[in-house]
């Protein structure tokens, strides 16, 4: 065997070992490195693109008493009707009156009208009015007249900036029926830009039933620079990782977001290292949102051959185009449907010789349904996603297809649940956060598509260099945090549990991990945020080696 083919053969042998368990710290793992990088990219996006504040405008409905037990005179009501412009569209509100079969006098008729009015307000139609015109109730028919509240004009409050745009943020247009849900969506679209803020006032217009929307929009310097440092990398590609991210907010003045990030290993010299780049752009279109994300990642390591050392390196590229729409929102619930198309490429080399066995190029789509519900002070998020690989965009068959241990067209279902509950005990402010994530697939999956546990982003208490992965699995992360007064610091305790199953798990040394963590996070000087923790394994398979699980992350914004 030639000297250049010897390390290629070695890496191929290691690839086979990896498919059955895990890579050691002394050899590069192409799949493990990419899985870790995908988690880091997700965390980066959460830091740079914080979730826009949820806007829930207060209701203005009156508190109503029940119908009077008896009125004199009163008229037996056998039918309830609605007339007026758009009466057919709003006829559903009549059910709130509960007037049919009752004997109503003046007080009861007025109460029936107010109940219908409250039903409209509860659905966000705060300027649409219901009236009772003079009529004869002897036939037993009560007729309510609807006057729809429409938007007459939309404008920015003075002084208005030339960078302010409402056309793609506000789902409604002049002439539309005014609804608070549209205004809430618009405010979320404005506030998704971290350097901008907005408020919308409803002002009466001259015409009956017409209102003007007046938008107060302001913006600070729309350029952000952030520097970050953490020890969340791996020993194989660099434990300490740093990144610099440039964000340009409202770049095209359509409430859009853009960032470019570049990262690399720090405090590390050959024989190993890594580099990454990320680019993201997204913009709202009323209830829609369009986004594009591009990432590439490179790592290298020098491995020892029989007589000399060889450079082993890996290159990967990820791209995704996403489209989402809020399909339902009310005072307490919001439902979003999303569609994502993705492509992933990865290649690995020894010196300049490509390892064909590790060449991957896959593509596919993912359909998602997400629900956010407000349960008093608590928030419950639920997500269901279905991912399917396809042959589009030049996708290649996976090397594992020859052995039946994976494929380039997987069908994978994932479920995400998150519960957040603030608590106050005396003067102490606490918060409970519980997250559950699961994955299911009937067929065999390649390593990058498998469910992975073990590490700071999954089950804490493990350094992440070794992990358990298989086609199916679940994990449960729990935190109890305590706000340390007004200092902006938070102390937290964590308890995590995870389990994998499926065909690939038959070759693992175990299937379940559990770990605990204690840490502190917060912000200092308004610009510096940090998170530092120490974690320990509670349950692990015999022979599952793991290093120290303490860690930190720092981020400073300018």
Region roles according to the model:
Residues 23-233, 263-276, 413, 435-437:
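Periplasmic polypeptide-binding modules associated with outer-membrane biogenesis and secretion
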Residues 209, 238-242, 273-277, 315-319, ...:
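Residues that define the transmembrane beta-barrel architecture of outer-membrane proteins
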Residues 213, 244-246, 279, 321-323, ...:
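Membrane-embedded beta-strands of outer-membrane beta-barrel proteins
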Residues 269-371:
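Transmembrane beta-barrel wall of Gram-negative outer-membrane proteins
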Residues 347-497, 501-503:
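C-terminal outer-membrane beta-barrel translocator/porin domains of Gram-negative envelope proteins
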């Amino acid at each position: 065997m030639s000297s250049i083919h010897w390390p290629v053969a070695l890496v191929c042998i290691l690839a086979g070992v990896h498919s059955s368990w895990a890579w050691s710290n002394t050899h590069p793992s192409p799949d493990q490195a990419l899985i870790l990088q995908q988690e880091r990219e997700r965390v980066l996006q959460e830091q740079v693109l914080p979730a826009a504040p949820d806007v829930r405008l207060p209701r203005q409905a009156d508190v109503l008493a029940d119908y009077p037990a008896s009125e004199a005179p009163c008229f037996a009501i056998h039918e309830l009707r609605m007339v007026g412009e758009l009466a057919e569209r709003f006829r559903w509100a009549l059910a709130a009156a509960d007037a049919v079969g009752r004997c109503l006098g003046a007080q009861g008729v007025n109460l029936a009208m107010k109940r219908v009015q409250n039903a409209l307000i509860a659905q966000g139609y705060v300027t649409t009015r219901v009236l009772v015109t003079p009529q004869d109730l002897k036939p037993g028919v009560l007729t309510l007249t609807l006057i729809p509240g429409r938007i007459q004009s939309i404008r920015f409050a003075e002084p208005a900036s030339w960078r302010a745009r409402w056309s793609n943020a506000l789902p409604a247009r002049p002439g539309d029926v005014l609804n608070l849900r549209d205004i809430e969506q618009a405010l979320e679209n404005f506030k998704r830009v971290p350097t901008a803020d907005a408020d919308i006032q409803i002002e009466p217009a001259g015409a009956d039933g017409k209102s003007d929307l007046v938008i107060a929009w302001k913006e600070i310097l729309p350029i952000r620079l952030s520097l970050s440092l953490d020890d969340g990398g791996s020993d194989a590609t660099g434990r300490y990782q740093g990144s610099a991210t440039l964000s340009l907010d409202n770049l095209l003045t359509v409430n859009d977001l853009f960032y470019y990030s570049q990262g690399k290993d720090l405090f590390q010299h050959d024989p190993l290292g890594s580099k990454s780049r990320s680019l993201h752009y997204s913009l709202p279109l009323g209830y829609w949102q369009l986004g594009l994300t591009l990432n590439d990642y490179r790592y290298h390591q020098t491995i020892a051959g029989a007589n000399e050392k060889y450079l082993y390196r890996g290159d990967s590229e990820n791209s995704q185009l996403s489209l989402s729409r809020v399909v339902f929102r009310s005072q307490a619930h919001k439902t979003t449907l999303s569609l994502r198309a993705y492509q992933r490429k990865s290649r690995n080399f020894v010196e300049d010789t490509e390892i064909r066995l590790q060449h991957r190029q896959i593509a596919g789509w993912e359909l998602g349904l997400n629900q956010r519900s407000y349960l008093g002070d608590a928030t419950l998020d639920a997500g269901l996603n279905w991912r399917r690989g396809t042959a589009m965009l030049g996708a290649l068959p996976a090397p594992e297809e020859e052995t039946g241990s994976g494929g380039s067209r997987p069908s994978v279902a994932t479920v995400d649940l998150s519960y957040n509950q603030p608590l106050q005990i005396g003067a102490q402010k606490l918060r409970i956060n519980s997250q559950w994530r699961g994955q299911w697939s009937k067929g065999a999956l390649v390593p990058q598509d498998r469910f992975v546990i073990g590490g700071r982003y999954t089950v804490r208490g493990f350094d992440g260099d070794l992990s358990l992965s298989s086609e199916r699995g679940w994990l449960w992360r729990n935190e109890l945090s305590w706000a340390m007064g007004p200092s902006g610091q938070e102390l937290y305790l964590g308890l995590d549990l995870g389990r994998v199953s499926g065909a690939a798990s038959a070759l693992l040394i175990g299937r379940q991990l559990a770990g605990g963590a204690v840490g502190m996070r917060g912000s200092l000087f308004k610009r510096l945020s940090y998170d530092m923790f120490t974690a320990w394994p509670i349950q692990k398979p015999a022979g599952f080696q793991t290093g120290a699980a303490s860690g930190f992350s720092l981020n400073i914004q300018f």
